[in-house]
Amino acid sequence: MGKVHRPRRGSLAFSPRKRAKSIVPRIRSWPKETEVRMLGFAGYKAGMTHILMIDDEPGLTNGKEIFMPVTIIETPPLRVFGIRAYRQGYLGLETATEVIVPDFELDNYVSKKAKGRKFTFYQLLKRRIATLPKNYTKDDFEQKLGNLEDMIKEGEIVEVRALVATQPWVIKLKKKPEVMEYAIGGTSVEEKFNYIKEKLGKELRVGEVLKEGELLDVIAVTKGKGTQGPVKRWGIKLRAHKDSKGRRKVGSIGPWHPARVMWTVPMAGQMGFHHRTELNKRLIAIGENGKLVIDGNEIEITPKGGFPHYGIVRSDFMMIAGSVPGAIKRIIRVRPAIRPPKKKPPVQRPQITYVSVESKQ
């Protein structure tokens, strides 16, 4: 229903509308789960396509074939490279210590420019974290890990999280990894620690962490659009045909008193490249090696001619219902839904009858 008084279409809750600090999105809140698993994953946005599927959610179209636009996010395996432990401080959680795995050689990355020379994980990680210890041996690692175990037994540590890095060289995107932190589900610090300890230095694939059919929250930095006027940025009305001094402006920027311009007045400025979270996106399916298995048949998810501005999907991928924020090739993070609806869809892959692989050019 329309409103008589409508100064803007955009929400002031997101003010100030400025550029995000980092292109790697942050996650400040985590769902509480008893299952021991990493609470989320990360990948790179490849593009969109559409599918036909049998609707398995309660409603008028239940059991019928429906059209569904989907986003493909390529998810090369994450590498767990450390543990971060927190103690309870006066103002909240404080970092108590970190344990980083010692350096090792990567089997899945060989530099063509360096005549086949293999890179170590540290060499690539240092492109993102300049403060990594230089002379860090296996003995140092085991000593730090033992100290952390003692702190957990004494009850000093209240939370442990996994430090992970993406591996974009696996999908031939770039060399510099993205580094981030993920919470772990579980009821005690000990079982969370044991889970991360087992995964340290190893790869973690999306199928080990997420389940087909579950609801996810998608966190990303939106497409940047630069400086835009108040009509596009805030959705204000165009002024009348014969209005003076411009049509795409606000009619008044405020009263005489208070003798200043309020921050709530819709003005021109930065639009896009904002940090945003979209809730309750369904994970339709998970594929491996760029292929989706449907009724025993393997289907290449890459459309004819490749995804525009992206190319070929080579690794594991997520198929998420609807659109997600962010530009092509941008890092996208997901976590299990923190505020799921009361009527949740079943946690299983819906029956997919058709996947569009026609050209998107």
Curated annotation (Swiss-Prot):
The gene is rpl3. The lineage of its organism: Archaea, Methanobacteriati, Methanobacteriota, Thermococci, Thermococcales. One of its GO terms (cellular component) is cytosolic large ribosomal subunit. Belongs to the universal ribosomal protein uL3 family. Pfam families: Ribosomal_L3. Keywords: Ribonucleoprotein, Ribosomal protein, RNA-binding, rRNA-binding. One of the primary rRNA binding proteins, it binds directly near the 3'-end of the 23S rRNA, where it nucleates assembly of the 50S subunit. HAMAP family: Ribosomal_uL3_A (MF_01325_A). GO terms for biological process: translation. NCBIfam families: L3_arch, PRK04231.1. GO terms for molecular function: rRNA binding; structural constituent of ribosome. Residues 339-361 are annotated as: Disordered. Part of the 50S ribosomal subunit. Forms a cluster with proteins L14 and L24e. The keyword rRNA-binding applies. This is Large ribosomal subunit protein uL3. SUPFAM superfamilies: Translation proteins. Residues 350-361 have a biased composition (Polar residues). It comes from Pyrococcus abyssi (strain GE5 / Orsay).
